[in-house]
């Protein structure tokens, strides 16, 4: 049973429901900190799922054998349980999952936040080796994980948060981070199962974080270009845009865009 956090109207709301998909190491909790309540207060049914092996969602099989298709199935299973097709909103790896989901599923719109680009994570992995060569190599060799990213508050801040996030918050968020194992889903993002933008028809908002060290402005712009739109960047933000001080600017931009793209819910 997947962990699902569900807030906002559950009846005959005229607004399209929103389905939030977290990134690697994270779970549905990262959306519950601010975004779910924000959008629920705007009248949107706001649903966040923890992908298998993340948050409180169990893994039916060892994560080393988990594929990107498994994550897409997780998103589809939650989306199929909603009364209308949801807008899908993905952060980081969750943005990659959303891109793959949209290849075979309809959605009225999609939002990508600091997303893995269609070209995958090769540059990201090279960056980890440059920044922490021995730590990255040791985790890949011994634990078969990407443990050089967020195993400590110090690494979590370096990877995900700006200096403006209080130490206590970074420690709290770091305590909620999961191990991200080198499974099929990681290989899919590296080269085996890259997105096919030509198969995607949903209108898309692509947002980047100005101070993101994981995915460069060039990669964010390439993502937007692949989906025939323009990238927008939130000033002063690090990678975890939904948890940073100033998260309201991100949420408000998404809300303004949704109000023009999805003013009412569409039937299945």
Task: List each model region and its residues.
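Conserved alpha/beta-hydrolase "acid-adjacent" motif
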Residues: 213-219
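Flexible "cap/lid" loop of the alpha/beta hydrolase fold
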Residues: 107-143, 185-188
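Active-site loop/oxyanion-hole signature of alpha/beta-hydrolase fold enzymes
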Residues: 56-86
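Active-site glycine-rich loops that stabilize anionic/oxyanionic intermediates
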Residues: 23-27, 92, 210
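Catalytic active-site module of serine/aspartate enzymes centered on a nucleophile-bearing elbow/loop
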Residues: 230-268
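Conserved alpha/beta-hydrolase
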Residues: 38-60
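Short beta-strand/loop motif that positions the catalytic acidic residue
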Residues: 200, 206-208
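The serine-hydrolase catalytic nucleophile loop
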Residues: 24-36, 218
């Amino acid at each position: 049973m997947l962990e699902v956090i569900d807030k906002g109207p559950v009846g005959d709301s005229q607004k399209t429901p929103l389905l939030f998909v977290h990134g690697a190491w994270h779970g549905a909790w990262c959306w519950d900190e601010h975004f779910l309540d924000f959008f629920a207060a705007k009248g949107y049914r706001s649903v966040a799922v923890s992908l298998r092996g993340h948050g409180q969602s169990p893994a039916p099989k060892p994560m080393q054998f988990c594929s990107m298709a498994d994550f897409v199935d997780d998103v589809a299973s939650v989306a199929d349980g909603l009364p209308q097709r949801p807008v899908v909103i993905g952060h980081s790896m969750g943005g990659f999952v959303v891109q793959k989901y949209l290849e075979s599923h309809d959605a009225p719109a999609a939002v990508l936040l600091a997303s893995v680009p269609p070209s995958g994570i090769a540059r990201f992995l090279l960056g980890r080796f440059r920044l922490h060569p021995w730590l990255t190599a040791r985790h890949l060799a011994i634990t078969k994980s990407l443990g050089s990213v967020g195993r400590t508050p110090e690494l979590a801040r370096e990877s995900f948060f700006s200096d403006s996030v209080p130490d206590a918050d970074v420690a709290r968020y770091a305590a909620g981070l999961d191990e991200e194992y080198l499974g099929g889903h990681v290989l899919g993002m590296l080269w085996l199962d890259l997105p096919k933008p030509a198969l995607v028809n949903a209108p898309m908002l692509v947002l980047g974080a100005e101070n993101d060290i994981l995915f460069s402005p060039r990669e964010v712009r390439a993502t937007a270009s692949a989906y025939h739109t323009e990238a927008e960047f939130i000033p002063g933000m690090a990678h975890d845009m939904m948890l940073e001080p100033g998260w309201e600017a991100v949420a408000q931009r998404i809300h303004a865009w949704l109000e023009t793209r999805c003013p009412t819910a569409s039937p299945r």
